[in-house]
Amino acid sequence: MAYQGTGNHSPPGYDDGGHRLQDLPAGNNYEEEASRGLLSSQTGPFTGPFDDPQQRNLSPARPTSGYSLTETYAADAGYHDPYSAGGSVYSAQSGENPATAFGVPGRVASPYARSETSSTEAWRQRQAPGGAGSGGGGGLRRYATRKVKLVQGSVLSVDYPVPSAIQNAIQAKYRNDLEGGSEEFTHMRYTAATCDPNEFTLHNGYNLRPAMYNRHTELLIAITYYNEDKTLTARTLHGVMQNIRDIVNLKKSEFWNKGGPAWQKIVVCLVFDGIDPCDKDVLDVLATVGIYQDGVMKRDVDGKETVAHIFEYTTQLSVTPNQQLIRPTDDGPSTLPPVQMMFCLKQKNSKKINSHRWLFNAFGRILNPEVCILLDAGTKPGHKSLLALWEAFYNDKDLGGACGEIHAMLGKGWRNLINPLVAAQNFEYKISNILDKPLESSFGYVSVLPGAFSAYRFRAIMGRPLEQYFHGDHTLSKQLGKKGIEGMNIFKKNMFLAEDRILCFELVAKAGSKWHLSYVKASKGETDVPEGAAEFISQRRRWLNGSFAAGIYSLMHFGRMYKSGHNIIRMFFLHIQMLYNTFSTILTWFSLASYWLTTSVIMDLVGTPSASNGHTGFPFGKTATPIVNTIVKYAYLGFLLLQFILALGNRPKGSRFSYLASFVVFGIIQLYVVVDALYLVVRAFSGSAPMDFDTTHGVGAFLGSFFGSTGAGIIIIALAATFGLYFVASFMYMDPWHMFTSFPQYMAVQSSYINILNVYAFSNWHDVSWGTKGSDKADALPSAKTTKEGGKETVIEEIDKPQADIDSQFEATVKRALTPYVAPVEKDEKSLDDSYKSFRTRLVTFWIFSNALMAVCITSDGVDKFGFTNSATDRTSRFFQALLWSNAVVALFRFIGACWFLGKTGVMCCFARR
């Protein structure tokens, strides 16, 4: 299908009625017309199931465009566009000069032609007024201008016409159903917010489209973004669009189908944390669906810096993670409904808490939603997951917050599980969702609702919960003083690294309220996990330090629960949970020693010949096994010491090999210990070892001997608490596959969680990663200067582009957006500072380990196994004898030198010239 003009012989304007959707008849007369369709020559990832050459009446030899807008931009016969090349549209695979394809024939290539490279520099150039590839010619076009009145004389809010292809992609039943004069589907609204989020109010002249249309917002879906690529962003955004379609398609809903269409009760808000870190390819994707346009942002308004750029549009378009464009084709259940979208692009990078302040304090207070769902870019919500989250709030009036199940992205055919780190994280996520989250949900207090996939009732978090939460926003540090981030001690700063835990505690402990938190198993989200050791360590540093500090905070302030409105039963279980959390914190604190002692004890039980094991050693015999165990123990302690050396002075990315080697060594040791433990179990049940159970004096005596056992009983308990409990719980939840695909890898990596991650986290407790990055990309944006019209109204002059130019620029944008994503190759080159630190680390490591090796060889009885003929006592005695003689020789040597110098100077003094 292609869009045809209507036959008007005047240039298309903003309210152009042309480009209506029509079926093209078969025949070669329309071959050239079809070839001029948007991206019609693309193949590969652009080809989709809706594009059948037979259905489209195109030649089978001609590659067809999948999931693309097939808008033609050919002008009518009576209208000549002086900037039209007259040829076919510049396609994704053609070798044409873009200056010729989009500009005046014969004109040299414009610097804006580099927009096709999707580089940051090209994006900067497109921000110039009229410079978004306008016509593609060399030099800027001169456009007519229009005067835009500022709201209350200070707020710049402008409506910009969207490309014809986007307008026409909206189904007619929605376009024709709006009130007269509505520009919801024809214009994108841009607002330059020059204020703090707390001042983004109706009183100050700011407003949002859903409120302007008097719509009730039931569900506000927020996507926070930092620097993710367009594949990750499209994965989240397209998943949200599909979930909204699931809600709109509900047939027998008591709520969504009353009081207006369901899609009008849902708003999607994207909050980007700064222009500088933002991937500019993502902006092309957003422009393709209509929620962003190049060249409209203003750096400041009359010298007052813009804090956030806010775009609003209602669209039916979506881009998949494979860069395929989805548009409405019929009224079937697979068609996406209109989605009210807001895009907030913060001018400077000011961290995630500030993004949430824009969401809750600025947009939330105007829209007043019932439920807010928080997603991170890269998290893909599963089928009907957002509906399941909302239903939890709808069915429980006291539910203040909820989260779904987050699982690791495993790739096609679960191929990511080949990486042991990914498999270990997959198992960790699964067990957390099977054991930890349901337990905490039963108590009513889930200690952490992951910021990547969670939901809150808006009125539940209003007040103190958000006030405490926003103390971590460094942009409020001057206003808050000592209560702000700059006035906090290092413990509180670490606490705000796990800001979602703070919000959870404050919500449950809210005075006079009885809000509780819950886990919704039916809601699932998929997220990518770190695949490299360096990235994994850096991520867990923030998680571990933040969660530990927040956990201590919740225990210390548990008394605030008594001011809440929870009933006595809930309070009883909250006390039980507090005791459980206290016990878990103590176990975590001593986990470093616990792992070492467990490793050492199991190896001694199995490898040291004694009467209990029949004077044998497993697995290498009674002679070799003690030697191997001694080597393993010293390797364990040596690499544990290495972790402190690395953590106190190196970046993980600067010590990739050292950390990778540490993971491998600890993994091998852990697997060796697991084999030893299984050997103990086999011996206990095979009769090779005596069973110290009382089976002759009744059940009570048996239980007493079982739980008091120091042999087989304790082994069985440990076995049941790990292998057995995990297997049983996983099968009960009918989700056991991780036990077969990820459990072995998790067992290998488990000790590294303590010996590497915890050591690095605690060694870098001082690193709270606050502060902002410099933002120089905003310099490319133009300023807005106001004038007084008639001495009264404040206006600005804004470029008034013809619709034909908007459409031609859009075609270049779509081509960039739908270009297959190629992941950049990350450079592992060390910086000069990293190389200096690496040398220091090697020097200190060699110094410490060489000294430790000598001390061990002299004093330890364990090295007797290596064939030393004398005992440790004899070696120590001889070492001290050698040391004393060495010091005596050195002292004597120094004394001889001093005497020689004294005698020489005395003699020479007699012969010196006067």
UniProtKB/Swiss-Prot annotation:
GO molecular function annotations of the record: chitin synthase activity
Membrane-protein topology: Multi-pass membrane protein
Origin superkingdom: Eukaryota
TM segment ranges: 543-562, 586-606, 627-647, 662-682, 712-732, 843-863, 882-902
Record note on disruption phenotype: Reduces drastically spore production. Leads to resistance to AFP, a small, basic and cysteine-rich peptide that exerts extremely potent antifungal activity by inhibitiing cell wall chitin biosynthesis.
GO terms under cellular component: cell septum; plasma membrane
Listed Gly residues bias regions: 130-140
SUPFAM superfamilies assigned: Nucleotide-diphospho-sugar transferases (SSF53448)
Catalytic reactions on record: [(1->4)-N-acetyl-beta-D-glucosaminyl](n) + UDP-N-acetyl-alpha-D-glucosamine = [(1->4)-N-acetyl-beta-D-glucosaminyl](n+1) + UDP + H(+)
Family of the protein in this entry: Belongs to the chitin synthase family. Class III subfamily.
Record protein name field: Chitin synthase B
